[in-house]
């Protein structure tokens, strides 16, 4: 974005439009680009990393008991389930509910994507419960509830809050990843889930500010007066750049942490 125009006299900074894209990772609208944007790629990778982290925290005994192929298979299945439920299903429902990403994807396509992906995730869960541990079936309705309640803002949006975001997309993936490999839940699972919840809350704090500026602010005006009497123009990019840089780095760091834990297990 170019710097804001200044009046010929008085040094008054005119209002300038904010950044045009609804999200820092959003592509130009139309065609296949809408579907890429719909996936929220950096955030989806971030939250899938929680599943991997949880699975890799399972005790050595669980990995030995299942044999490496079996353990990796279960962790892969859990990750695939979350990729469907969160990466596709939840985001399709979110876009259906108010078009926050401003895509041109038809409503019927969004409904189809959400239905097929969420049902696919549930099917993976059922297979896991039948072939591994029956109690894992309890996680299926919990996950289904979280996807629907959060993204459709059920109960007047009561579940569409910072805390529920941290629990649903931070703590729950860690728990499921661990349970998929270990077949149970232990103290270390709770600690890792707390880590994921707190990190997700940090994500939410940064992303909420960015969303507000990108999607709700129509113009920005003003300037910063520095201690040395210099003045710098204030625009939307200055308001969002620090938070977006933090989000980029945190998403990358979480993916690298998950990759590190995979390498450790290998």
Tell me what each language-model feature is:
Residues 3, 11-38, 43-44, 71, ...:
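N-terminal transmembrane signal-anchor/hairpin module of polytopic inner-membrane proteins
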Residues 107-181:
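Intramembrane alpha-helical segments
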Residues 182-266:
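Membrane-interface module
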Residues 33-38, 42-55, 74-81, 87-136, ...:
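Multi-pass membrane catalytic core of lipid/isoprenoid biosynthesis enzymes
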Residues 13-33, 89-106, 203-241:
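Cytosolic, membrane-interface loops and tails of multi-pass inner-membrane proteins
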Residues 59-63, 94, 98-102, 133, ...:
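Transmembrane helix-loop junctions in multipass membrane proteins, especially transporters and channels
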């Amino acid at each position: 974005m170019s710097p804001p125009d200044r009046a010929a006299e008085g040094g008054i900074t005119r209002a300038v439009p904010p950044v045009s894209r609804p999200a820092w990772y959003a592509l130009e609208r139309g065609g296949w680009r809408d579907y890429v944007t719909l996936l929220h790629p950096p955030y989806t990778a971030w939250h899938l990393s929680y599943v991997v982290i949880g699975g890799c925290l399972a005790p050595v005994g669980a990995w030995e008991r299942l044999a490496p192929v079996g353990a990796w298979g279960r962790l892969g299945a859990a990750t695939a389930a979350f990729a469907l439920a969160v990466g596709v299903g939840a985001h399709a429902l979110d876009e259906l509910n108010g078009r926050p990403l401003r895509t041109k994807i038809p409503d019927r396509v969004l409904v189809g994507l959400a239905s097929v992906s969420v049902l696919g995730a549930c099917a993976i869960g059922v297979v896991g419960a039948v072939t591994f541990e029956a109690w894992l079936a309890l996680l299926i309705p919990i996950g289904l509830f979280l996807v629907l309640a959060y993204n459709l803002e059920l109960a007047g949006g009561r579940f569409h809050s910072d805390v529920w975001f941290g629990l649903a997309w931070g703590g729950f993936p860690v728990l499921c990843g661990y349970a998929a490999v270990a077949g149970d839940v232990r103290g270390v699972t709770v600690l890792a889930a707390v880590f994921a919840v707190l990190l997700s809350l940090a994500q939410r704090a940064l992303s909420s500010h960015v969303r507000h500026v990108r999607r709700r602010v129509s113009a920005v005006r003003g300037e910063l007066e520095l201690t040395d009497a210099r003045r710098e123009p204030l625009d939307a990019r200055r308001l969002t750049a620090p938070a977006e840089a933090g989000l980029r780095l945190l998403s990358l760091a979480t993916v690298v942490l998950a990759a590190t834990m995979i390498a450790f297990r290998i």
